[in-house]
């Protein structure tokens, strides 16, 4: 009892036995809780509005400073490149003209369901405002300027992957992030991504002259000082065509005389340098005679006044098959027929002039239909990091040839393919057709579904790996420091019973499949063609693959498969297992999104060699149905090894589905012959181990040695191939 009295003295409301008091106390507590919650929400809303007003005041301050004649920058005007975007994507965006919010709630009529978005700098504008927008977009050409100058602008988007180090003012080293109480408005350079306070800009401009060094990606960026805008004069088209053709003819003749003179003077040296390339002299003469203008140090393709290559003109080139092993002795960077030359040139707005010999720009190809179809956002992020001129979008009407034509006179450049395995093969085919003396090495940004080639080159299995590697900026830096390796390419000929080709040959980089796996790929391909909107993410793509595979489990379509195909490897007949429902010929160690079919660590098969993507040998395995494919995917089973060899024949005795690198079709009875076609240079992300860094450094040293004419392109190619073989 005494204890109850003491407890009641300390907590009278809790221990009161009066029900009315209890209800009142609970009501009071609930009221206090609601009041506290409302207060917190009010404070949060006030803080949000405060922050929003601060950001808006910053934007207005920057806009006012840009209108100040004394503060205008000496940069050529560049209009925005507008495209339509749904208003749902306008969240947290302000119009770059009226500075009003573009939130979706303000879309009242149907005409306002879209807005204009700049594909280069990310600026947004209302329909009625876009025509009045200031011409302060990224200026891709600064020909005539002595130095690249900063292009200060409002940071309309966060897609530039800002790092912690770049969030400070480049002049005063103070933080550029806004505080709760405000702060100083900032500018962001569209080239180097550095930030500067608007108040600091005048002092910085007086001290440095606003010279921009293009930032940490300067070697990959196509410098605007060397990008020249093409001027077209329709009225003088015929006369200019004649003049242009005469200039080309004179330039080519002069170059031939110089080459012959150089060969006379350096006969012994050339024969020692080229080694066994003498047998290709007739072939090189033939190839240069039947093509249009070719490019090297003296072979000017456009204007004779523009020369972007210097070096020995007697270096090797690729043979008629585009192979890397044997190269003719005439140096050139690319070949185009007259019709193709004029057709490609008409599609370009710019050309490259007087690039320095140590330039290493990156040529980017994007296939926005690959995988999750995120090409638009990826393109805009690349426009922010690089020069928009060096970024090309692939489509059914424009292939890689246009970009390669623009870069045809660049002695050393690298290629980035943003897409899947099919896109990578498309670009490799186009590179091979140009007969580059120094073929560019290719890196892959995995934007497809399986991304098998990207996996074996350490670039990851999807766009999620880009963020895990530190963002797009880090990936671009990894490309600059990547090691060059080689990839075997295989020619697949489709022959009838008489040995005649039924269609042009196809080329394989990853694998070729016949049977159940090709059937699943064909079903997915048809579904994508009918309903492309269903393939909006890499995960959903794999779910659809799994669904189609599950359907095929109950379908015994390939129970007679072992008697419908005959396999021959290096002239030896290979027995197809009776439970086989598919045959796979693999060139790389990744299939169907990361499945290792050969498994080099497996010691069960002692009579087989480890798999390699540049040993000029393919591996043949069998799979026993779609259920087996599913178990391979989760690591519960293994493919059955059948053979290894350099020449494979697969005879189809019945109509069967076939796929090459994920591109499927139904094939009537025929014979598929697979033979080694050549090798392509690829970029492999350097691992953390010292060996990976050493390979990247050696690659850079060899490129510099070729630039300084210590070695020629043929010698560099041979050394790179040898290095790739020894370091694997």
Swiss-Prot record:
Residue ranges of domain DAGKc in the record: 357-496
Top-rank lineage group of the source organism: Eukaryota
Membrane topology: Single-pass membrane protein
Single Gene Ontology BP annotation: defense response
Transmembrane domains' residue ranges: 27-48
Subcellular location: Membrane
EC number from the UniProt entry: 2.7.1.107
SUPFAM superfamilies per UniProt: Cysteine-rich domain (SSF57889), NAD kinase/diacylglycerol kinase-like (SSF111331)
Induction remark: By volatile C6-aldehydes ((E)-2-hexenal, (Z)-3-hexenal, (Z)-3-hexenol), and allo-ocimene.
Gene Ontology MF terms in the entry: ATP binding; calcium ion binding; kinase activity; zinc ion binding
Family: Belongs to the eukaryotic diacylglycerol kinase family.
Misc: Treatment with (E)-2-hexenal, (Z)-3-hexenal and allo-ocimene increases plant resistance against the necrotrophic fungal pathogen Botrytis cinerea.
PANTHER family to which the protein is assigned, alphabetical: DIACYLGLYCEROL KINASE, DIACYLGLYCEROL KINASE THETA
Subunit structure and binding partners: Monomer.
Protein name in UniProt: Diacylglycerol kinase 1
Organism: Arabidopsis thaliana
Classification lineage: Eukaryota, Viridiplantae, Streptophyta, Embryophyta, Tracheophyta
């Amino acid at each position: 009892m005494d204890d109850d009295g003491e407890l009641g003295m300390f907590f009278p409301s809790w221990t009161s036995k009066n029900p009315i008091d209890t209800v009142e106390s609970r009501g009071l507590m609930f009221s206090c809780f609601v009041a506290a919650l409302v207060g917190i929400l009010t404070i949060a809303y006030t803080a949000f509005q405060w922050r929003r007003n601060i950001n808006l005041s910053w934007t207005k301050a920057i806009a006012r400073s840009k209108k100040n004649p004394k503060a205008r920058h000496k940069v050529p005007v560049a209009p925005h490149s507008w495209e339509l975007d749904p208003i749902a994507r306008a969240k947290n965006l302000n119009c770059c003209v009226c500075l009003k919010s573009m939130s979706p709630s303000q879309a009242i009529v149907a005409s306002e369901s879209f807005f204009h978005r700049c594909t280069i700098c990310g600026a947004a504008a209302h329909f009625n405002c876009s025509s009045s927008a200031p011409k302060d977009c990224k200026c891709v050409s600064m020909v005539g300027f002595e130095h690249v100058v900063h292009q200060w602008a409002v940071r309309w988007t966060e897609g530039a992957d800002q790092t912690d180090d770049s969030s400070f003012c480049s002049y005063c080293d103070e933080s550029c992030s806004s505080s709760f109480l405000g702060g100083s408005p900032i500018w962001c350079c569209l080239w180097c991504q550095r930030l500067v306070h608007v108040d600091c800009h005048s002092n910085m401009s007086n001290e440095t002259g606003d010279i921009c060094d293009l930032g940490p990606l300067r070697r990959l960026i196509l410098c605007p000082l060397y990008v020249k805008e093409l001027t077209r004069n329709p009225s003088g088209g015929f006369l200019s065509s004649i003049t242009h053709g005469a200039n080309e003819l004179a330039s080519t003749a002069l170059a031939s005389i110089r080459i012959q003179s150089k060969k006379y003077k350096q006969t012994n040296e050339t024969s020692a340098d080229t080694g066994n390339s003498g047998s290709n002299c007739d072939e090189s003469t033939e190839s240069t005679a039947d093509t249009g203008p070719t490019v090297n140090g003296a072979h000017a393709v456009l204007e004779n006044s523009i020369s972007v290559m210097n070096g020995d003109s007697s270096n090797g080139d690729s043979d008629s098959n585009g192979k890397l092993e044997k190269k003719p002795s005439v140096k050139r960077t690319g070949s185009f027929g007259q019709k193709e030359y004029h057709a490609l040139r008409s599609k370009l707005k710019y050309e490259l002039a007087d690039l320095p010999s140590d330039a290493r720009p990156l040529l980017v190809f994007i296939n926005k239909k690959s995988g999750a179809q995120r090409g638009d956002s990826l393109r805009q992020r690349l426009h922010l990091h690089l020069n928009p001129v060096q970024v090309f979008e692939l489509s059914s009407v424009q292939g890689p040839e246009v970009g390669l034509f623009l870069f045809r006179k660049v002695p050393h450049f690298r290629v980035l393919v943003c897409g899947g395995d099919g896109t990578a093969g498309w670009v490799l085919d186009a590179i091979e057709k140009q007969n580059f003396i120094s073929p560019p090495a290719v890196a892959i940004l995995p934007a497809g579904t399986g991304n098998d080639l990207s996996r074996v080159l350490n670039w990851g299995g999807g766009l999620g790996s880009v963020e895990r590697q530190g963002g797009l900026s880090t990936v671009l830096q990894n490309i600059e420091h990547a090691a060059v390796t080689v990839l075997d390419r295989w020619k697949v000929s489709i022959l009838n019973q008489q040995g005649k080709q039924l269609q042009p040959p196809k080329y394989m980089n990853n694998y070729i499949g016949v049977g159940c796996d090709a059937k699943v790929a064909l079903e997915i391909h048809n579904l994508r063609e009918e309903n492309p909107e269903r393939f909006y993410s890499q995960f959903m793509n794999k779910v659809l693959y799994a669904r189609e595979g599950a359907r095929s489990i109950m379908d015994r379509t390939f129970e007679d498969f072992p008697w419908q195909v005959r396999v021959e490897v290096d002239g030896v007949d290979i027995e197809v297992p009776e439970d086989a429902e598919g045959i796979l010929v693999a060139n790389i160690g990744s299939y169907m999104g990361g499945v290792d079919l050969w498994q080099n660590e497996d010691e069960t098969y002692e009579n087989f060699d480890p798999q390699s993507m540049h040993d000029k040998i393919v591996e043949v395995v069998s799979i026993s149905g779609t259920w087996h494919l599913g178990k391979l995917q989760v690591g519960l089973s293994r493919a059955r090894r059948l053979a290894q060899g350099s020449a494979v024949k697969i005879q189809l005795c019945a109509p069967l589905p076939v796929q090459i690198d994920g591109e499927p079709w139904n094939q009537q009875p025929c014979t598929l012959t697979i033979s080694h076609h050549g090798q392509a240079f690829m970029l492999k992300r350097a691992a953390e181990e010292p060996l990976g860094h050493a390979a990247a450094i050696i690659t850079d040293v060899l490129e510099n040695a070729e630039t300084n004419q210590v070695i020629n392109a043929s010698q560099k190619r041979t050394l790179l191939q040898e290095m790739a073989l020894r370091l694997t």
